[in-house]
Curated annotation (Swiss-Prot):
The keyword DNA repair does not apply. Keywords: Ribonucleoprotein, Ribosomal protein. The lineage of its organism: Bacteria, Pseudomonadati, Thermodesulfobacteriota, Desulfobacteria, Desulfobacterales. Residues 33-43 have a biased composition (Basic residues). This is Large ribosomal subunit protein bL35. GO terms for biological process: translation. Gene3D superfamilies: 4.10.410.60.
Length: 65
């Protein structure tokens, strides 16, 4: 039985925390920022925790976590 490949796109976008939760960064925060409000840009800088509904999909993409 061959090894399962890790999805490299997902591996670059998601990090596992010490408690086992999945941390990720929001999109839309790198360019075309003039039209976005100060509050929106500030909120985009923060990292976020993945919800339980999407956790199953990420675990399938990253089998060796």
């Amino acid at each position: 039985m061959p090894k399962i490949k890790t999805n490299r796109a997902a591996a670059k976008r998601f990090k596992k925390t010490g408690s086992g939760k999945v941390k990720y960064s929001k999109s839309f925060g790198s360019h075309i920022l003039a039209k976005k409000s100060r509050k929106r840009k500030r909120d985009l800088r923060q990292s976020h925790i993945l919800d339980e509904a999407n956790m199953k999909n990420i675990k399938r993409l990253l089998p060796y976590w």
